[in-house]
Amino acid sequence: QNYKGNLEFIIIDDNSKDGTKKIIYNFRNEDSRFKYLSTTNLSSNLKHKKKALDLGIDKAQYEWLLFTDVDCRVKDNWVNEMSKHYKYSDYVIGLSRVEENKSFVSKFQSIDFSMLMISASSSVSMNNPLACSGQNQSYKKSIFEKVNGFNEISDLLQGDDSIFLQLCQKIKNI
């Protein structure tokens, strides 16, 4: 990333078996901004992704949090582009797309996800965001703390993105 401000990369390993720890430690040898955290042996009422996100947010040293997923590719200017919107809102929703291949399922997934992103974009333009994707969103740590994190939605398997966005809207016009 070519962002010039304070930045850290927190990688949370949610019990993967793919050598994530070794990969991140190799990155850390070249760039001290990389941090490795693991949910192994972590006691929490949260499950899966929300448990991992909660750990990373707790350990984050900066106010603004920016999220993507391990299977996503971001451009070199991703942090710069998202941070341009920080002066306008405490919660920034980025658009994403699914990389498609020639299979029918892939094409269908791409269309389905594109429709979600179009709906999300439209609702944002009407100052009433309804949905977002956890693979491209950013919000302030203080907002997360103000809504008591994911605790209200801890029983849901998902919800770290759109449902969490709706929780945040209850306390602040985003």
Regions from the PLM with identified roles:
Residues 1-42:
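Acidic donor-binding segment of Leloir-type glycosyltransferases
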Residues 39, 68-70:
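Catalytic metal- and UDP-sugar-binding loop of GT-A-like glycosyltransferases, i.e.
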Residues 19, 70-85:
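Acidic donor-binding/catalytic loop of UDP-sugar-dependent glycosyltransferases
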Residues 14-17, 72-74, 98, 137:
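Acidic metal-phosphate-binding loop of nucleotide-sugar-dependent transferases
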Residues 162-174:
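Catalytic donor-sugar/metal-binding loop of nucleotide-sugar-dependent glycosyltransferases
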Residues 145, 149-163:
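Donor nucleotide-sugar recognition loop
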Residues 28-56, 81-147, 151:
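Long helical/loop segments within the catalytic core of UDP-sugar-dependent glycosyltransferases
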